[in-house]
Amino acid sequence: MTTFYTVVSWLVILGYWILIAGVTLRILMKRRAVPSAMAWLLIIYILPLVGIIAYLSFGELHLGKRRAERARAMWPSTAKWLNDLKACKHIFAEENSSVASSLFKLCERRQGIAGVKGNQLQLLTDSDDVMQALIRDIQLARHNIEMVFYIWQPGGMADQVAESLMAAARRGIHCRLMLDSAGSVAFFRSPWAAMMRNAGIEVVEALKVNLMRVFLRRMDLRQHRKMVMIDNYIAYTGSMNMVDPRFFKQDAGVGQWVDLMARMEGPVATAMGIVYSCDWEIETGKRILPPPPDVNIMPFEQASGHTIHTIASGPGFPEDLIHQALLTAAYSAREYLIMTTPYFVPSDDLLHAICTAAQRGVDVSIILPRKNDSMLVGWASRAFFTELLAAGVKIYQFEGGLLHTKSVLVDGELSLVGTVNLDMRSLWLNFEITLVIDDAGFGGDLAAVQDDYISRSRLLDARLWVKRPLWQRITERLFYFFSPLL
């Protein structure tokens, strides 16, 4: 009996080391950033079983077998649709400003189509204004409405949007709603999901959380886009979820969320529609390619309309494009660069680009919330402050709530707005969307919004920052080490 237990013990030990070695080899063989690999190895060696389970659950990009097959199957028809769209030559821009030229060339070469022109844009910075405008557009819809949000939180004006959407479905408008399973858990536990389906709305729970399949699909891969398309002509996107800030996370201690949304009319709605159709097919298997844009761009629209490139990220879309776009934007800056983000955990490349811009004389400002709803990200972001301040970057800490706006403005003319946070999860993991806008008028509007944020912020003093307590520095470095995983 003693011999039996000895053999079993040795087999368990051998199996343990084989498992550790196998996971280590798998991490090393994957194409990933060195800091990310080192962070995973440290976790696995310090907490072996917990680390291995965490890595198998969250360490690799698993879309799931069924979704991966759908993504492969949809590409030929999507590619044909994009090729056919090129026949609508009147919607594509032929020239761009000098500051936007490099970025638009990058987007065109990687996505296969140029930016679209003749769009009319309106920036909305108040949640009530966003929802009232959306309700009006829903009430005037004639054919179809498509929506996708990371979070839909019942309560307040979000319920009025839901009521207007159900009324539209009852009068014959084809309504589709896709919500992330994790982000919108409160919605799916409420009566609203059943009420909407009973009204005729197609409601899809995207990337459904299922602990029984935790090793078959990455659970923290999330549908993070916020988009609305109406009649293939009106579109919304930005940082705002379908929540009323007065009812959302009131016990988080960070104040009301502050967001920005863009309301658009024009061909950009078609570009966003193809992104939505891909998401819908990956999730449901149903193909809903949008029709070509039924618009004739008049001369005055061509002269005054905004030129926009739509960049989507996530499985099935050009890899690393949003990250490349941010790098290109930073390196294109000549006068000033302003960034706003709630979560700041940049890649080494992006951090280097931001610091280099400041060191070559560009006026660089980053606006972050003073209080963050994520303790981990809050501490990790502080670990980058010393290097940024040393390079001459201005760091503004917003004190008017949780600044949730994601925006970049370069030289007053090139703008990026959308759903992308400046962290690893948004840059390389989630389904995200960003608009790249080449227009000085829109840039002026965005600059006014960012100036308002700065007026409600405190400029971080580099002299005081270096005097912070030792325990804070240690905590920052600890979270900095694990920043590639956040």
UniProtKB/Swiss-Prot annotation:
Keyword Cell membrane on entry: yes
Alphabetized, the UniProt keywords read: Cell inner membrane, Cell membrane, Lipid biosynthesis, Lipid metabolism, Membrane, Phospholipid biosynthesis, Phospholipid metabolism, Repeat, Transferase, Transmembrane, Transmembrane helix
The terms describing its cellular component in GO are:
plasma membrane
Q: Supply the EC number(s).
A: 2.7.8.-
Residues forming the PLD phosphodiesterase domain are 219-246, 399-426
Membrane topology value: Multi-pass membrane protein
Q: Which InterPro entries match?
A: Cardiolipin_synthase (IPR022924), CL_synthase_A (IPR030840), CLS_N (IPR027379), PLD-like_dom (IPR025202), PLipase_D/transphosphatidylase (IPR001736)
Q: Does the keyword Cytoplasm apply?
A: no
The protein's name in its UniProt record: Cardiolipin synthase A
Q: What is the lineage of its organism?
A: Bacteria, Pseudomonadati, Pseudomonadota, Gammaproteobacteria, Enterobacterales
